[in-house]
């Protein structure tokens, strides 16, 4: 059984329920009055595991932070004038303030222990593919795309090499994109003018693998590509004919074995 703790106890539960009710479609139906949004964000910042932990409580009103508790400071501080009365009030509540200071252990370190196995220690190996953005590849400006998908955690390093020499100029990236299933993807592109015989390599380093993943793309002329495709097509066609021939052969053999020899009955 997984038990996640929330700071604030029943106060937080009541606040969460209230916000959910106020933001529901039924509550907003037919209401044309100005709406106000109150948010409470609780953040845990971990450094080197749980060796050093920082707890933050941020009070946000209409997308503007007005009040903050920082465990490194030990008390509430007003970010705007709107938050000053609340800061003075909460700092006067000694028991409540001690609970906030203890949240580093009771909230952050506790939940770290609960979720470490499926968050911090989780590893999913990336899938890497390389392809040109345009079909006309040689002697023209092109983008070579290195697609890295389905990996976790998000820390990753992608490099481009041309003929074993790292390429740094002309490299652009989409940055990390969340897939929505606890995995990430990214596209790292190299702007270049491919020439026949050149070998481009996308190298990916990620915590899920012990050694870098590499995928090559070789620049080939259209005639070379046509010859290669013709060779592949001929090979596949040969396999089909071979399979058909073997099928007919074994079928005939089975038919012959089922025939009984005829002779005179004495």
Swiss-Prot record:
> What happens to this protein after translation, modification-wise?
Ubiquitinated by MARCH1 and MARCH8 at Lys-254 leading to down-regulation of MHC class II.
* Region feature Beta-1, mapped onto this chain: 30-124
Localization of this protein: Cell membrane; Endoplasmic reticulum membrane; Golgi apparatus, trans-Golgi network membrane; Endosome membrane
Record's CDD domains? IgC1_MHC_II_beta_HLA-DR
Tell me what effect the entry lists for residue 232 to I. Answer: In allele DRB5*02:02
What does the annotation give as the result of altering residue 59 to G?
A: In allele DRB5*01:02, allele DRB5*01:03, allele DRB5*02:02, allele DRB5*02:03, allele DRB5*02:04 and allele DRB5*02:05
The record, for Pfam families, names:
C1-set (PF07654), MHC_II_beta (PF00969)
Q: How does it assemble?
A: Heterodimer of an alpha and a beta subunit; also referred as MHC class II molecule. In the endoplasmic reticulum (ER) it forms a heterononamer; 3 MHC class II molecules bind to a CD74 homotrimer (also known as invariant chain or HLA class II histocompatibility antigen gamma chain). In the endosomal/lysosomal system; CD74 undergoes sequential degradation by various proteases; leaving a small fragment termed CLIP on each MHC class II molecule. MHC class II molecule interacts with HLA_DM, and HLA_DO in B-cells, in order to release CLIP and facilitate the binding of antigenic peptides.
Please give the name of this protein: HLA class II histocompatibility antigen, DR beta 5 chain
Q: Organism, per UniProt?
A: Homo sapiens (Human)
């Amino acid at each position: 059984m997984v038990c996640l703790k929330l700071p604030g106890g029943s106060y937080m539960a009541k606040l969460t329920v209230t916000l959910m009710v106020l933001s529901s479609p039924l509550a907003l139906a037919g209401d044309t009055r100005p709406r106000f949004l109150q948010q409470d964000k609780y953040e845990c910042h971990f450094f080197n595991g749980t060796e050093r932990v920082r707890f933050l409580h941020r009070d946000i009103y209409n997308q503007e932070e007005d009040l903050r508790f920082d465990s490194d400071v030990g008390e509430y501080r007003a970010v705007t004038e709107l938050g000053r009365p609340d800061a003075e009030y909460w700092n006067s509540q000694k028991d409540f303030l001690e609970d906030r200071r203890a949240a580093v252990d009771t909230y952050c370190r506790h939940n770290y222990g609960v979720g470490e196995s499926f968050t911090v220690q989780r590893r999913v190996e990336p899938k890497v593919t390389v392809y040109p953005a345009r079909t006309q590849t040689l002697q023209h400006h092109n983008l070579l795309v290195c697609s890295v998908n389905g990996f976790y955690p998000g820390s990753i390093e992608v490099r481009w090499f041309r003929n074993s020499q790292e390429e740094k100029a002309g490299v652009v990236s989409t940055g990390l994109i969340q897939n929505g299933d606890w995995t990430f993807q990214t596209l790292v592109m190299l702007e270049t003018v491919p020439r026949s015989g050149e070998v481009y390599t996308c190298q990916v380093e990620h915590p899920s693998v012990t050694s870098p993943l590499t995928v090559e793309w070789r620049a080939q002329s259209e005639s070379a590509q046509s010859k290669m495709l013709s060779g592949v097509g001929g090979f596949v066609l040969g396999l089909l004919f071979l399979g058909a021939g073997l099928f007919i052969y074994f079928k005939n053999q089975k038919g012959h074995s089922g025939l009984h020899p005829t002779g005179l009955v004495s």
